Design a protein with these regions (language model features):
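N-terminal chloroplast transit peptides
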Residues: 1-36
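Sequence-pattern detector for short linear motifs
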Residues: 7-8, 22, 36-37, 52, ...
Length: 487
């Protein structure tokens, strides 16, 4: 659903909040020439495969150049011979039942890395989050009801954690214990840290379950850890526990191959009859692949968020392992889940699908490139909403590449990442944040670019009970207001 409102708060009240996973942003698009971190640049074939997609991704002449990120030297010394290894998987979290939805939405909107109010309105963040979550909860519950009543993200993350531990042991001889820290719902990151402390972990690998780094996903989770580590250096300082962060891993060969293999499986499923149906004078290429990445507003990229470049690089690497256009496969890239009145990264998925239909595309594989497990944005937004739009647009043969979930090659790649991190110079949370411009956002927030309605909170009144809840909400030790079950 496209939302265009002059009032920022009014627009927020219409957000399908169950789909808002991160809000970072983009400016002018240029193909990446070099891979961030370790590794080399993209191959010429990968860059060529993305030419068409890159040409689509323009925000106009007003877009600003991306802020360059200066590399940060890693900490001296590597983690050697740890006695108790822990792996902390960071993820978004999601409501497990309908009763959890409102609390989950509140925590999402109360995060200033997701919704940034202008400085003068920042003290109202908790109240705004309460109003939005209360208003949006019924519709969001309907979305979750359509996929079984709750998010499966925790189930998949637990399965990934368990299998990764097994792979670490079998492939690398490393005994480790995995912990899960969710940003917006149980088990919260703070709970994971308590367990890590109680278990006496002295070497911790921090692995965000987001292949591409964004200030509002991996960055937001790392902020929580950074604040906790700073406040409790007696528990988490270098004298007690070494830690190292894997900030992004979109360019890992095992990850790239895993995604490409799943796409190939879907491409191979088109029958000869469907191939014939998809070939015409209007559309000579019979099979098409649409990478649908989570979109983000432009202002974050202008502040240095590397997410856009990493998406482009990632799609280029995967595309290089797929059949070429001469071999009957054409690649496209779009961005989904935009909300509110500000400019987001283009082209939008709900614009691209009708356009592909007009071009005579009949056979399409949609790839949820930002996600490593099924959740509301794959199971409801893509599988239900976008599928219906595609069929209405004349794309008769629809396929969706599954998320990686517990794919064996992906699990092994997770284990390999952790094992390598234990034997390489460590990268601290602070270094990871600085290297990816976390905390480098301009004081002018996303919302400061929008007109604030003078009619109050989007014209929606709030009663004394709601205001009282805002005042009574307890703050955790990091001065972040969070809502938990029973609040």
């Amino acid at each position: 659903m496209i939302i265009r409102r002059s009032s920022f708060i009014s627009a927020l009240l219409l957000i399908d909040s169950s789909r808002l996973h991160h809000a970072s942003g983009f400016s002018s698009i240029q193909p990446p020439h070099r891979v961030a971190g370790t590794g080399t640049g993209m191959s010429p074939s990968a860059t060529t495969r993305l030419d068409a997609a890159t040409a689509l991704l323009s925000l106009g002449d007003s877009a600003k150049a991306v802020v360059a990120v200066a590399p940060v030297a890693p900490s001296a010394g590597a983690i050697s011979d740890p006695t108790k290894v822990g792996v902390l998987l960071l993820n978004l979290g999601g409501p497990e039942t309908g009763e959890d939805v409102e609390g989950f939405l509140y925590n999402l909107f109360a995060d200033p890395d997701i919704i940034r109010l202008p400085p003068l309105l920042a003290p109202l963040q908790s109240l705004v989050a309460l109003v939005i979550s209360k208003r949006r909860a019924p519709k969001s519950r309907e979305a979750y009801d359509s996929i079984g009543g709750g998010s499966p993200i925790l189930q998949y993350t637990r399965a990934q954690a368990d299998l990764m531990v097994d792979s670490l042991r079998e492939r690398h001889g490393v005994e480790a214990k995995a912990y899960i820290g969710m940003r917006y719902w149980y088990p919260f990151t703070e709970e994971a840290l308590d367990d890590i402390r109680k278990d006496g972990i002295n070497a911790l690998v921090i692995l965000p379950m987001y292949p591409q780094f964004s200030i509002s996903t991996s960055g937001s989770s790392l902020r929580v850890l950074q604040e906790e580590f700073a406040k409790r250096s007696d528990l988490y300082g270098p004298q007690k526990m070494f830690h190292t962060v894997i900030p992004s891993w979109y360019d890992r060969p095992g990850y790239v191959r895993s995604v490409a293999n799943l796409i190939r499986r879907e491409l191979d499923s088109f029958t000869p009859e469907e191939i014939e149906e998809g070939t015409s004078e209007l559309q000579p290429v019979p099979r098409h692949v649409l990478f649908s990445a989570h979109g983000v507003p432009a202002s974050y990229i202008e502040a240095g968020d590397p997410y856009r470049d990493q998406i482009l690089d990632c799609v280029g690497r995967i595309s290089a392992l797929l059949p070429s256009e001469e071999e009957g496969v054409k690649v496209h890239l779009s961005f989904q889940s935009r909300v509110g009145p500000v400019e987001w990264l283009r082209p939008y998925t709900d614009d691209v699908l009708p356009s592909l239909g007009e071009q005579g595309v009949k056979n399409l594989v949609v790839v949820p490139i930002s996600f490593v497990s099924e959740h509301i944005e794959t199971l409801e937004e893509i599988d239900i909403e976008y599928r219906e739009l595609a069929l209405e647009s004349g794309i008769t043969n629809w396929r969706r590449s599954p998320a990686l979930n517990t794919d064996a090659s992906f699990i092994n790649e997770m284990a390999d990442m952790v094992a390598e991190a234990l034997n390489e110079p460590s990268q601290s949370i602070t270094e990871a944040c600085v290297a990816n411009n976390v905390g480098n956002l301009a004081l002018e927030s996303v919302s400061s670019q929008m007109e604030i309605s003078s009619a109050g909170v989007g014209g929606v009144g709030y009663d004394d009970d709601l205001a009282g809840r805002a005042r009574r909400l307890r703050k955790d030790r990091y001065s972040r207001t969070i809502l938990k079950r029973g609040d």
